[in-house]
């Protein structure tokens, strides 16, 4: 029997690959999708905040933001208190793209969880959250 941590890593990698495959024709990667989602939840986040939230380096986040900006999916403006930092928001095109991506990611997640009942899905989420809470205590 494989250790739980290993199974979690394989599940995460498999999910990432399935998400990338599902969104490939939209030109969106899983990290770009995550950034679009974060900006939908919390408009105006800085690049540093996005990097922390996405578990990537600031350099990687700068590349993600650059690519999304070049594609017209986000809008950037100087931070009101610090003229140096830039706040980032979804553009209307970014919102439309996020909706399309969410449909595909939801389908991937449904496939991933298709062998579980609704109660088992809830239990899995609760157990994983318990693991996260234990490690962050």
Language model segments and positions:
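Residues within the alpha-helical elements of helix-turn-helix
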Residues: 38, 53, 71
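Charged, amphipathic alpha-helical coiled-coil/dimerization segments
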Residues: 16, 66-129, 136
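Short alpha-helical elements of helix-turn-helix
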Residues: 2-6, 26-37, 62
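N-terminal leader segment of winged-helix/HTH proteins
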Residues: 1-26
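Short, locally clustered residues in the helix-turn-helix/winged-helix DNA-binding domain
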Residues: 9-12, 37-41, 102, 129
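Residues within helix-turn-helix
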Residues: 47-48, 59, 66, 86
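Short capping segments at the starts of secondary-structure elements
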Residues: 42-46
């Amino acid at each position: 029997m494989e250790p739980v941590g290993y199974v979690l890593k394989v599940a995460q990698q498999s999910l990432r690959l399935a998400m990338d495959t599902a969104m490939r024709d939209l030109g969106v990667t899983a990290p770009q999708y995550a950034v679009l989602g974060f900006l939908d939840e919390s408009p105006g986040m800085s690049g540093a905040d996005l990097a922390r939230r996405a578990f990537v380096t600031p350099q990687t986040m700068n590349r993600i933001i650059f690519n999304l900006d070049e594609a017209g999916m986000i809008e950037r403006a100087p931070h009101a208190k610090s003229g140096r930092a830039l706040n980032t928001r979804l553009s209307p095109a970014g919102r439309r793209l996020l909706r399309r991506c969410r449909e595909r990611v939801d389908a991937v997640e449904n496939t991933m969880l298709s062998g579980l009942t609704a109660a088992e899905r809830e239990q899995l989420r609760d157990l994983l959250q318990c693991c996260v809470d234990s490690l962050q205590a």
